[in-house]
């Protein structure tokens, strides 16, 4: 690997790169689920659930003579937010059907469980962040590939 390639590799995984990726993913993701949490006063015992799915599909085509190669990367992020009659909020994120992340925010926790809950929440947060960064990196790698291919064609 040349020095130029090494520099590019370092840049790709820098804090700034990750922050930029997170901003882009936030925009794509949260623009679509913003305002989905709602409350109903018609029936106090009614569970309120909102579901939303974001599909990020990347398709790339490489054409050389008669050979055609197509690469497709799909990232599916499913989000379900539910609020039940005890004001407990459950958020579920599912990434590519193979991992489900459930975050429970239970307002009825007693003080003895708070420390343990905070520790678990922190672990869960770190795990989600790690998955999120992987998706973000993949998103930008594919985007970068597309830009390079476009430039090469011109």
Swiss-Prot record:
Segments of skewed composition (Basic and acidic residues): 112-124
Residue span of region Disordered: 104-124
Name of the protein this chain belongs to: Putative uncharacterized protein DDB_G0279989
Species name: Dictyostelium discoideum (Social amoeba)
Lineage of the species this protein comes from: Eukaryota, Amoebozoa, Evosea, Eumycetozoa, Dictyostelia
